[in-house]
From Swiss-Prot:
Stored InterPro entries: DEAD/DEAH_box_helicase_dom, EIF4A_DEADc, Helicase_ATP-bd, Helicase_C-like, P-loop_NTPase, RNA-helicase_DEAD-box_CS, RNA_helicase_DEAD_Q_motif
Catalysed reactions, as listed in the record: ATP + H2O = ADP + phosphate + H(+)
Chain ranges for the short sequence motif DEAD box as given in the UniProt record: 174-177
Protein name, entry field: ATP-dependent RNA helicase eIF4A
Record motif Q motif, residues: 25-53
Gene that this sequence comes from: TIF1
Protein purpose: ATP-dependent RNA helicase which is a subunit of the eIF4F complex involved in cap recognition and is required for mRNA binding to ribosome. In the current model of translation initiation, eIF4A unwinds RNA secondary structures in the 5'-UTR of mRNAs which is necessary to allow efficient binding of the small ribosomal subunit, and subsequent scanning for the initiator codon.
Pfam families: DEAD (PF00270), Helicase_C (PF00271)
Helicase ATP-binding domain location: 56-226
Intracellular or extracellular location(s): Cytoplasm
Entry comment, domain topic: The Q motif is unique to and characteristic of the DEAD box family of RNA helicases and controls ATP binding and hydrolysis.
Alphabetical UniProt keywords: ATP-binding, Cytoplasm, Helicase, Hydrolase, Initiation factor, Nucleotide-binding, Protein biosynthesis, RNA-binding
Family designation: Belongs to the DEAD box helicase family. eIF4A subfamily.
GO cellular component: cytoplasm
Amino acid sequence: MASNDKGLEEIPEGQIESNYDEITDSFDAMNLRAELLRGVYAYGFERPSAIQQRAIMPVIKGSDVIAQAQSGTGKTATFSISALQKVDTNLKACQALILAPTRELAQQIQKVVVAIGDFMSIECHACIGGISVREDMKALQDGPQVVVGTPGRVHDMIQRRVLKTDHMKMFVLDEADEMLSHGFTEQIYDIFQFLPQSTQVVLLSATMPQDVLEVTTKFMRDPVRILVKKAELTLEGIKQFYIAVEKEEWKLDTLSDLYETVTITQAVIFCNTRRKVDWLTDKLTARDFTVSAMHGDMEQQQRDVIMKEFRSGSSRVLIATDLLARGIDVQQVSLVINYDLPANRENYIHRIGRGGRFGRKGVAINFVTADDNGRTRKAKRKKGI
């Protein structure tokens, strides 16, 4: 961890330049501990994805690493495998801390760590809001080797001196662009101050806005930079369609027509506000369409139930805000509908990335009103569409 690295100041905002091109194209060649390798294969991996081929080895070797890669490329397993390789299973203390922007993503990462580490004596705790502070404190006092959490709760537990950082080897920031854009900057900077100087920093982000680049210059030492190129991202496998809807009020009928004509395995419909999610859910339900909805105003328990139903397939259409656009991995999502176009291009990447996880094919349909046209042209230019 560094405080004044200047190596990235010349990098243009938006995309980093790779400075590392070594590829390890099989898990067997990574010299992973036997019980970890067994867990990797038991989880269902056969060969590493593009980011796993490039990033796992430098992380295991101890380098600070910046990886620019989108959700759906296998990055969760990248840092999970690396962390599990590095921790001392005999030491009951937090050695790897992983931050994520939402509770759902933190819980998902925890499940991946636990599953891949199934044959190791490893504990992984999800340190998130929505569960009682007392429960959190008890779990942390047991000394889990890996802690996954959201910035607010992790910061609180460190300040209470319940989450001890003395033995910390690795600090991972997943979806760094999202965390920093949602007002977690101060808490994240504070967390850095509590970590030992020797802590390895791994940062993952789909986009590289200025606030992310500032973190890399302040806290990382000569980082290995890995860019998984756009051609290797999940957008490549996603067909994008634009439907011109002259007026906002015509969107509902357009969606109803689509619903009746398109065969959907599972779909996510994105709206820009929580109020719109509730309104659209009510309107579609009144038309006898079966849908479920999720947004940040809901209790954590309710959100967990909805996600469980959606993952299991008992619910096939989910209406959501951007809360869901980051990192929620539902394997069968084949269609994403932007009922409202997102406010920025970063969220567009994350939203439609739901429909092509790990390189699978998917479809994104965007409803475009006259007011949206200028933004659409701009987004298309930036995406090379």
